[in-house]
C-alpha cells in the first residue's frame, strides 16, 4: 500500500526529472538509466486513465514543470482550481495504486 506522502514525494521526483530531462538523457550513455525512469513510466501509464482535466493539469504541473500560477494562465483556470486539481491528481494516484495492491 502506498501512502499519500509517498505519492507526493514521487511526484516531486517526477517534476525534478522532467525539469532536467536533458541531463538525465546525456548521463544515460555514460552512467546508465536512473531509477526515476521506472517511476515516471508507472505514473504516466496510470495518468492516462484519468479524467481529461486531471490529465491536463498533471501534464502542465509535472511534465511541463509549470507553477500553479503559470498552469492557471496557460490552461485558463484559476489558481485555486489548479490547487484543487493537484489534490485530485494525488487522490487519483492513491486510489489507482492502492487498487493495484488489493
Named regions from a protein language model:
Residues 49-66:
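Short amphipathic alpha helix immediately N-terminal
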Residues 54-58, 79, 101:
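Secondary-structure boundary/capping signal
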Residues 64-81:
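Helix-turn-helix DNA-binding module
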Residues 42-46, 58, 81, 89:
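Generic hydrophobic/packing signal
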Residues 85:
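Residues within the DNA-recognition helix of helix-turn-helix
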Residues 1-49, 69-70, 97-102:
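N-terminal interaction/assembly modules
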Residues 90-98:
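C-terminal flanking helix
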Amino acid at each position: 500500500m502506498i501512502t499519500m506522502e509517498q505519492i507526493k514525494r514521487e511526484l516531486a521526483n517526477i517534476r525534478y526529472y522532467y525539469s532536467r530531462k536533458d541531463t538525465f538523457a546525456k548521463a544515460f550513455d555514460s552512467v546508465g538509466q536512473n531509477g526515476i525512469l521506472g517511476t515516471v513510466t508507472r505514473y504516466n501509464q496510470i495518468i492516462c486513465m484519468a479524467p481529461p482535466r486531471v490529465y491536463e493539469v498533471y501534464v502542465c504541473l509535472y511534465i511541463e514543470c509549470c507553477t500553479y500560477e503559470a498552469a492557471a494562465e496557460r490552461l485558463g483556470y484559476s489558481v485555486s482550481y489548479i490547487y484543487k486539481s493537484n489534490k485530485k491528481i494525488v487522490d487519483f494516484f492513491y486510489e489507482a495504486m492502492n487498487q493495484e495492491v488489493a
